[in-house]
Amino acid sequence: MTELKIKTEKVVKQLTKESLKPVLKVPKAKIDNASQFYATGKRKNAIARVWLKVGKGKIVVNNKILNQYFPSETYIKTILQPFLLTKTIDQYDVICTVRGGGISGQKGAILHGISKALDKSAPCFHAILRKGGLLTRDSRVVERKKYGQRKARKKTQFSKR
């Protein structure tokens, strides 16, 4: 009887320890040095092809360093978001080519592509990236112009009399 009591106390202690752990604990990923991961990201009219491989954190976009391609610091911060969430900021090198769209669309496409490639590299990152909303494609695109109107929603001025 006492042995059963001791075992149950141990189980209860383990359960309380596990419940006290933080929810977003980032597990250590087993990284294969020889592998390279490919993913495509899309946003508006931009399509990014992203190659992710183990390295020192170097990011190249259309044969230019990230700082040269995106001069704005806010764009750079959003592109680095998947690495900050998974705490792998200096573990991967990124090479990507982007076509179509503007700067904002290209930024979103690169972000989506990096997130998908990170998910392929280590499946333990899937829950973290999903919770951050980085794996879902942002499907918002420009609404088309309708005939008889000035723009997509703007109409000609209406006169009652």
Curated annotation (Swiss-Prot):
GO biological process: translation
Gene3D superfamilies: 3.30.230.10
Entry keyword Nuclease: no
SUPFAM superfamilies noted in UniProt: Ribosomal protein S5 domain 2-like
Keywords carried by this UniProt record: Ribonucleoprotein, Ribosomal protein
Record-stated family: Belongs to the universal ribosomal protein uS9 family.
NCBIfam families: PRK00132.1 (NF001099)
HAMAP family according to UniProt: Ribosomal_uS9_B
Record protein name field: Small ribosomal subunit protein uS9
Organism, scientific name: Rickettsia typhi (strain ATCC VR-144 / Wilmington)
This protein's encoding gene: rpsI
